[in-house]
Amino acid sequence: MLYTQAKAYLVGKLKEAGLKTKPYTTMKSLSRSMESHVGAVLPGTEMIARNGSKTIYQDQEGAQHKRRKLFDRNVTFQVVLGEYTDDKVEAMLEKFLAALDQGIEVDGNFVPLAAESVEWSTEEDHPLKAEVAVTVNITFRGGVYRDIGLHRARDYRLEDIGKNNGKEPANGN
């Protein structure tokens, strides 16, 4: 769900930043675009690494659970903004960056996000009709988790504790 929710989040933030057209989500449709005022959320890379960290937490009913993080997932998207002038692209970029939150919630887990790099290009450097374009790499740092319920032992009785002076019992004695 991380990929889907992160993509939808970025599309929404592009609209908040002042994009008037529907954001593109594939490079093929973006390169075919004849618009000069353009925005896109394109898939980037995903890094996966094994992680074995554990934490114990209580749910809303008070039951304790152990959550194990099986994998780290770093999903990167490329957000493209294009416009006629540098000033308009920069204004849209600043609105977009200002609209970004610290992270998003995915399946009850907080997933932080970071804007990692920005690349500017002119019409000679990209296939868009826009005069100036900027590409921002946004990375979401999430994970794959497994929850296990913790059960407390109840109704147990200690029958007998025997001391054998350091000798091993023979035949249960």
Where do the protein language model's features map onto the residues?
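C-terminal tail/extension regions appended to the core domain(s) of diverse proteins
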Residues: K15, A130-N173
